[in-house]
Amino acid sequence: MKIYFLIYDKVEELDLVGSWELIGLLAEKGLCEKPKLISLNSMTPSGEHGMRFSADYHFTDPVQPDVLFVPGGSGARIAMEDIDVINYLKKTAENCHSVLSICTGMYLMQKAGLFKHKKVTTHWAFLEHLKKDNTVTVVE
């Protein structure tokens, strides 16, 4: 199973690294391939607090994950205005087993329409944003 993480400038490091740790443990047990990073901008984006990452792929590369994690960070609110990024998420989600957001990664998924008619939640500070979307059921 291919499990990839979307990264971008100003990604929240904890959202990315915490989940990466769990998937890495699964990979060590042979339950999935080693996780990979797909960048939305440069191949070496910086996180919210300055941590640098080295991407395995750019979102324009022809790769298809089985599972895609979309971590949060202030950069998500910038990336959600890029139509190419939104189209990438829509197209990739069609062939994914699962697409998961962490915290404000939900901005990207919501903009791509991936939450329609689903139950969703996020960090309490961002619930009001989700509640404005009448196509989703917000779980607190």
Label the model's feature ranges.
Residues 120:
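Anionic-ligand binding patches
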Residues 124:
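Class I SAM-dependent methyltransferase SAM-binding "motif I" and its flanking Rossmann-like core
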